[in-house]
């Protein structure tokens, strides 16, 4: 039995100079300093949903400076552009030293992404862990859901404590 021919390893696509992907980058010091990159959507004529989940998002309380933690779920129906995931990771990490209330963080992230990629539709769910015994869940979306778009539940259970 003969062996199949050896295939040469796939050559990586050269990194685009416009993107952070494929390049060493400096961690942004604030959300305003962070850059969100977009790439062309090869399936722009098809309605579909893309989901990013950040289960360990952190920011700071603007009053006490104490850390706040959230599970973020970002759903969007892409238009001409896709959100590049490395830039999203860096953008979300920039909140680690940023003081803002839960509502401001969640809605601000949704608005910033929507402004950058101009999706057909976007929603963000911010499921914040309790501070002072009260969990805060924040939801925002750009508008009406495109007809026929399948959007699964965000899959984050309501906070139940230890019970």
From Swiss-Prot:
EC numbers for this chain = 1.7.1.13
Q: In which pathway does it act?
A: tRNA modification; tRNA-queuosine biosynthesis
Q: Which domain of life is it from?
A: Bacteria
**Keyword set for this entry?**
Cytoplasm, NADP, Oxidoreductase, Queuosine biosynthesis
Q: Which GO terms describe its cellular component?
A: cytoplasm
Identify the main location. Answer: cytoplasm
Q: What does this protein do?
A: Catalyzes the NADPH-dependent reduction of 7-cyano-7-deazaguanine (preQ0) to 7-aminomethyl-7-deazaguanine (preQ1).
Protein name, per record: NADPH-dependent 7-cyano-7-deazaguanine reductase
Q: Which organism is it from?
A: Rhodopseudomonas palustris (strain BisA53)
């Amino acid at each position: 039995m003969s062996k199949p021919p050896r295939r040469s390893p796939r050559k990586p696509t050269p990194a685009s100079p416009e993107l952070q992907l494929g390049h060493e980058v400096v961690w942004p010091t604030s959300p305003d300093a962070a850059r969100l990159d977009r790439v062309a959507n090869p399936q722009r004529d098809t309605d579909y949903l893309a989901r990013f989940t950040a289960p360990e998002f952190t920011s700071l309380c603007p009053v006490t400076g104490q850390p706040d933690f959230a599970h973020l779920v970002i759903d969007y129906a892409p238009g001409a552009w896709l959100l590049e995931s490395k830039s999203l990771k860096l953008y979300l990490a920039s909140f680690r030293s940023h003081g803002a209330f839960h509502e401001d963080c969640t809605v601000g992230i949704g608005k910033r992404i929507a402004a950058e990629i101009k999706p057909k539709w976007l929603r963000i769910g911010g499921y914040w862990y309790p501070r002072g015994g009260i969990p805060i869940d924040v939801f925002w979306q750009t508008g009406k859901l495109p007809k026929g778009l399948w959007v699964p539940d965000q899959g984050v259970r309501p906070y139940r404590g230890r019970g």
